[in-house]
Regions:
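Short beta-edge/loop segments at beta->alpha junctions of small alpha/beta modules
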Residues: 2, 15-91
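Short, leucine-enriched amphipathic alpha-helices that occur as contiguous helical runs
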Residues: 4-13, 178
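Short, charged/polar micro-motifs that form catalytic or ligand-binding hotspots
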Residues: 17, 36, 117, 167, ...
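Hydrophobic alpha-helical interaction segments
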Residues: 139-243
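Short gly/ser-rich loop at a beta-strand->alpha-helix junction or flexible surface loop bordering the NTP-binding
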Residues: 62, 78-154
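Short, well-structured alpha-helical interface segments that form or flank functional binding sites
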Residues: 22, 42-45, 122, 126, ...
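Short, Lys/Arg-enriched, disordered terminal segments
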Residues: 1-7, 242-243
Length: 243
């Protein structure tokens, strides 16, 4: 099926050009205006071939991207702490990350970086005691008023929070950047680690420079009840042209 000399493949490439991310439904609507008989199967098959050729990349359920490099967090900043917790509590379900892992995306580099540990609420005190005994500056699930008054940011600062169960366990390891960005938004509200504009700039810098799983991020944001602000920033990316 063609439009003039252009194939469906050509039109998808043209549609994707200049976009960091796009939705399947958005693409289909654009093409259906010119090809009333275009089926979802034909469109999906063409997208599959473009992905296989490396021109377009998967960005989660119903989302695509023109960014080849997938977002990954450097594990080094939390490796020592992670190993300490694993040695002491080998059967504990937990995860951790640090703002240091996002250092390449800050517009203004913070004076101190903060690490976060998430685990079962009944286990947090034991983890806090362990980290405190190893010279970490720890805070156990501080609420907004407490956090803004009493948290002292310095080297090896760790905030411990209850682990939010998200979908299946097997989906967790691959979603660390997406989760960290959503969790950081919540921390801007609770701890005032950075203001809204700095957060927005960091978010934009990250998702323009490497590819995220947009669908997974939106699912997690919905689970954490912050889907609107996260979606708004993603839509801002969609409204700007990629180089």
């Amino acid at each position: 099926m063609t439009s003039g000399k252009k194939t469906i493949k050509d039109e998808i490439i043209e549609f994707a050009k200049g976009r960091y991310y796009f939705r399947f439904d958005e693409l289909r609507q654009s093409l259906v205006n010119q090809h009333s008989g275009l089926s979802n199967d034909t469109l999906k098959k063409t997208l599959y071939l473009l992905k296989k050729a490396g021109g377009i990349f998967d960005a989660g359920r119903g989302w695509y991207s023109t960014i080849a490099q997938e977002c990954r967090l450097d594990k080094a900043p939390v490796q020592e702490m992670e190993q300490l917790i694993k040695r002491s509590f080998p059967f504990l379900d937990f995860r951790c990350w640090s703002t240091l892992q996002l250092r390449d995306y800050f517009h203004h580099m913070p004076n101190w970086f903060v690490s976060f540990v998430y685990s079962d609420i009944d286990s947090l005190q034991a983890v806090k005691d362990l980290l405190t005994d190893h010279n970490y500056n720890t805070y156990l699930n501080p609420l907004k008023q407490e956090a803004r008054k009493f948290i002292e940011l310095r080297e090896k600062t760790v905030i411990l929070r209850p682990l939010v169960v998200y979908r299946s366990a097997r989906s967790m390891p691959a979603l660390e950047p997406e989760k960290a960005i959503v969790d950081l938004y919540l921390e801007t509200e609770l701890t005032n680690l950075l203001d809204r504009e700095e957060y927005r700039r960091l978010f934009l810098a990250l998702i323009r420079s490497c590819r995220i799983n947009v669908a997974a991020m939106l699912d997690y944001a919905r689970n954490r009840k912050v889907s609107d602000p996260i979606r708004n920033i993603i839509e801002e990316v969609n409204s700007t042209k990629a180089p």
